[in-house]
């Protein structure tokens, strides 16, 4: 059921907003003790707002587009008066005194914030296993991970616990879990959506975006949260087009480039490769022209990312010292001891690992050899994309090299975990928009994600291609069983 379907049902009185919210709360109470996709459920607040919206509907008031629709929020987005932990012990009791720009826009659009979703601690991870509050499980198979770091947002949509959600994407943290959980997930162009109120991981890479069950719902959420924000100087003052208007347009004559480097990689699973290539053939049948494109430095993205992102993280996370807010170690004799112990006890092992990597890369003897060189390679990756978009409209690749891997399989193997973001990282380094949508299933009936990458601020074109594929393939209609038998 799309947002438009819900609007019609609410307007006609066939269903009330309170009923929509209560149904999702009941479902959360039934399924989430197993999945652990939510950290906080706003039961009373959500029902109260739903009742208010129902009264407005009964009075015939003109309502904003997402009125009465339950949406979940990743727990690294500040929500005024509602605890925001970033899935970390160090922020366990942090209650923001302000609202992030994107959540404020959603609330102004009438959306009902049903809860805050689980994630990898400080968005550092690819499996939602580094959360201080326990891992999230994949609703398609609870022995598998949902991906990360926005695993709770992806799993909650896939399991039908909400109609849409917000996540953040630094190196694939929306698209990879969207692929693993069989939902639509989109990372906008860097600067399209405000980061004000997003707890920072890597400021030059982080971007907020939507999860949804279908492309049109993702487009609606993106429409609401996009735009210039005076509180975030990295947002760009470019008019936001009407994304819904382009969804139904034909893709006949559009050039779509297959990124050769992705399909040649030895870590790419056969099922994934075959499904994505089959998806390219379907797009060709819809009138698109499929061409091969080489991005020579595409596979250099992962090494580049794991210098730049930890370097930025080491600076951003220096603010958590136990002094002004967050977890504070007790019984320490000096400020230095208190700060050291607060960070040692408050941060998890993956966060500490990345802080150490970043601190090392920025140290006096190594900043030129590592950080400066990584920034130079980042520029070359961006130039490869610039060259590619002179020849094609959209690029096509798998979202992830594999389908969802087993819980615990990679948690003690950082290199294996990092490689799961191999195909998503380059778009972040170049600041490009990219979307993942379900395109098939592997032999174990786990979802496979198709990734489309666009040129800067061409989200509309991406959504157009994605929507035409979705309507033709109809993979999105498959939903996970919810008895959660092993």
UniProtKB/Swiss-Prot annotation:
<dbReference type="InterPro" id="IPR004412">
    <property type="entry name" value="GatA"/>
</dbReference>
<dbReference type="GO" id="GO:0005524">
    <property type="term" value="F:ATP binding"/>
</dbReference>
<comment type="function">
    <text>Allows the formation of correctly charged Gln-tRNA(Gln) through the transamidation of misacylated Glu-tRNA(Gln) in organisms which lack glutaminyl-tRNA synthetase. The reaction takes place in the presence of glutamine and ATP through an activated gamma-phospho-Glu-tRNA(Gln).</text>
</comment>
<protein>
    <recommendedName>
        <fullName>Glutamyl-tRNA(Gln) amidotransferase subunit A</fullName>
        <ecNumber>6.3.5.7</ecNumber>
    </recommendedName>
</protein>
<keyword id="KW-0067">ATP-binding</keyword>
<comment type="similarity">
    <text>Belongs to the amidase family. GatA subfamily.</text>
</comment>
<keyword id="KW-0547">Nucleotide-binding</keyword>
<dbReference type="InterPro" id="IPR020556">
    <property type="entry name" value="Amidase_CS"/>
</dbReference>
<dbReference type="InterPro" id="IPR036928">
    <property type="entry name" value="AS_sf"/>
</dbReference>
<dbReference type="GO" id="GO:0006412">
    <property type="term" value="P:translation"/>
</dbReference>
<dbReference type="InterPro" id="IPR023631">
    <property type="entry name" value="Amidase_dom"/>
</dbReference>
<dbReference type="InterPro" id="IPR000120">
    <property type="entry name" value="Amidase"/>
</dbReference>
<keyword id="KW-0436">Ligase</keyword>
<feature type="active site" description="Charge relay system">
    <location>
        <position position="149"/>
    </location>
</feature>
<dbReference type="GO" id="GO:0050567">
    <property type="term" value="F:glutaminyl-tRNA synthase (glutamine-hydrolyzing) activity"/>
</dbReference>
<dbReference type="Pfam" id="PF01425">
    <property type="entry name" value="Amidase"/>
</dbReference>
<dbReference type="GO" id="GO:0030956">
    <property type="term" value="C:glutamyl-tRNA(Gln) amidotransferase complex"/>
</dbReference>
<feature type="active site" description="Acyl-ester intermediate">
    <location>
        <position position="173"/>
    </location>
</feature>
<keyword id="KW-0648">Protein biosynthesis</keyword>
<comment type="subunit">
    <text>Heterotrimer of A, B and C subunits.</text>
</comment>
<feature type="active site" description="Charge relay system">
    <location>
        <position position="74"/>
    </location>
</feature>
């Amino acid at each position: 059921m799309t947002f438009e379907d819900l609007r019609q049902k609410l307007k006609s009185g066939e269903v009330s907003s309170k009923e929509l919210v209560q149904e999702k709360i009941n479902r959360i109470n039934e399924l989430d003790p197993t999945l652990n996709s939510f950290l906080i459920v706003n039961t009373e607040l959500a029902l109260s707002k739903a009742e208010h919206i129902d009264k407005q509907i009964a009075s015939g008031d003109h309502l904003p587009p997402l009125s009465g629709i339950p949406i979940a929020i990743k727990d690294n987005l500040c929500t005024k008066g509602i605890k925001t932990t970033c899935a970390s012990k160090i922020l366990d009791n942090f209650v923001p005194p302000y609202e992030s720009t994107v959540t404020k826009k959603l609330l102004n659009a009438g959306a009902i914030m049903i809860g805050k979703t689980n994630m990898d601690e400080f968005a550092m991870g690819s499996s939602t296993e580094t959360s201080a509050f326990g891992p999230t499980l994949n609703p398609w198979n609870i022995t598998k991970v949902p991906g990360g770091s926005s695993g709770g947002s992806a799993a909650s949509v896939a399991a039908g616990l909400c109609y849409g959600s917000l996540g953040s994407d630094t190196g694939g943290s929306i698209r990879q879990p969207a692929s693993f959980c069989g939902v639509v997930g989109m990372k906008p162009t860097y600067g399209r959506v405000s980061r004000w109120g997003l707890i920072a991981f890597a400021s030059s890479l982080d971007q907020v975006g939507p999860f949804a069950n279908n492309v049109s719902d993702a487009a609606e959420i993106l429409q609401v949260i996009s735009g210039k924000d005076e509180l975030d100087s990295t947002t760009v003052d470019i008019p936001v087009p009407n994304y819904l208007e382009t969804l139904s347009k034909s893709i006949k004559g559009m050039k779509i480039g297959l990124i050769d480097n992705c399909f040649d990689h030895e870590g790419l699973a056969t099922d994934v490769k075959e499904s994505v290539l089959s998806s390219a053939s379907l797009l060709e049948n819809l009138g698109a022209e499929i061409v091969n494109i080489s991005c020579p430095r595409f596979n250099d993205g992962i090494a580049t990312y794991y210098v730049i992102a930890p370097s930025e993280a080491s600076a951003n996370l220096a603010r958590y010292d136990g002094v002004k807010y967050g977890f504070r170690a007790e019984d320490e004799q000096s400020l230095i001891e208190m700060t050291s112990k607060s960070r040692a006890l408050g941060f998890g092992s993956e966060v500490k690992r990345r802080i150490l990597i970043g601190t090392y890369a920025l140290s006096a003897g190594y900043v030129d050899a590592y950080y400066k060189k990584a920034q130079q390679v980042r520029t070359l990756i961006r130039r490869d994309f610039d060259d590619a978009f002179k020849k094609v409209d959209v690029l096509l690749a798998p979202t992830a090299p594999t389908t969802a891997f087993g819980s615990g399989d990679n948690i003690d193997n950082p290199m294996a975990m990092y490689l799961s973001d191999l195909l998503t990282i380059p778009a972040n380094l170049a600041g490009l928009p990219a979307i993942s949508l379900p395109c098939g299933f592997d032999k174990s009936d786990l979802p496979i994600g198709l990734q489309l990458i666009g040129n800067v601020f061409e989200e509309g074109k991406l959504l157009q291609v994605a929507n035409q594929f979705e309507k033709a393939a109809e993979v999105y209609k498959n939903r996970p069983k919810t008895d959660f038998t092993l």
